[in-house]
Amino acid sequence: MEKEKLTDVPLHQIQIKDAFWDKYIRLVKDVILPYQWNTLNDNVKDAAPSHCIKNFKIAAGEAEGDFEGAVFQDTDVAKWLEAVAFTLDSSGRDETVSYTHLTLPTIR
């Protein structure tokens, strides 16, 4: 049996046009990503601080202080950036871009 050769499809060529999924794609873009941004920056009232962005700023020399939180918390920022990148590529640029402009220079 011959194996079928698979090829990559650029993400911008993929469009999800379905009423069921559209609702969730909009929810991620309009509600979840901004909420997560606030969580990563310790701006959610009554939520335990994550120290994620603060730790990156300390490591980059942009802020003073000591590392706080779990050693694996940098992955939260990486996962958030991946979700933002997917959202931007599939729905176009919007206010979410400003969050990445604030984050990317720090983690370089």
Question: Could you say what each language-model-derived stretch is?
Answer:
Residues T100-T106:
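Conserved small/polar residues in nucleotide/adenosyl-binding loops
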Residues W21, K79-E95:
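Well-ordered alpha-helical scaffold segments within catalytic/enzyme domains
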Residues Q73-E82, I107:
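Residue-level signal for functionally critical sites in structured catalytic/ligand-binding pockets
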